[in-house]
Amino acid sequence: MVRVKRGNVAAKRRKKILKLAKGFKGAHSRLFRTANGQVMKALVYSYVGRKRRKRDFKRLWICRVNAASRSHGLNYSKLRNLMKQASLNINLKMLAQLVLFDKKAFSQIIDLVNK
């Protein structure tokens, strides 16, 4: 039976991990074992971060809409309920954009909903 040397495959695998660890401090970017652990941890953090980003933006949009609607005498919950009753379907992101960039349009929405 011919002996299989894995030098090529192992070197490629290590090189790939060390390339991913570029920018890490100290041994975390130079030594394979520590770099491997840190890369795995970083990949987990990035996966979790992508899920978390969605939650964070939703919270931010709700805060913005709530603050703007309170200045008109409504809170966020009542505003969304009144919008639903008026069959006004504007998603949360667009509503937050209106609050930031077009306060006049947001005021018109409030007036339309309050009728």
UniProtKB/Swiss-Prot annotation:
Highest taxon of the lineage: Eukaryota
Statement: the UniProt record of this protein carries the keyword Transmembrane: no
Keywords: Chloroplast, Plastid, Ribonucleoprotein, Ribosomal protein, RNA-binding, rRNA-binding
Subcellular localization: Plastid, Chloroplast
An example molecular function term from Gene Ontology annotations: structural constituent of ribosome
Principal location: plastid
PROSITE patterns: RIBOSOMAL_L20
InterPro entries named among the record's database cross-references: Ribosomal_bL20 (IPR005813), RIBOSOMAL_L20_CS (IPR049946), Ribosomal_protein_bL20_C (IPR035566)
BP terms from Gene Ontology: ribosomal large subunit assembly; translation
GO cellular component labels: chloroplast; ribonucleoprotein complex; ribosome
NCBIfam families: rplT_bact (TIGR01032)
HAMAP family: Ribosomal_bL20
Function, as annotated: Binds directly to 23S ribosomal RNA and is necessary for the in vitro assembly process of the 50S ribosomal subunit. It is not involved in the protein synthesizing functions of that subunit.
Family from the record: Belongs to the bacterial ribosomal protein bL20 family.
Protein name from the UniProt record: Large ribosomal subunit protein bL20c
Organism listed in the record: Emiliania huxleyi (Coccolithophore)
Species lineage: Eukaryota, Haptista, Haptophyta, Prymnesiophyceae, Isochrysidales
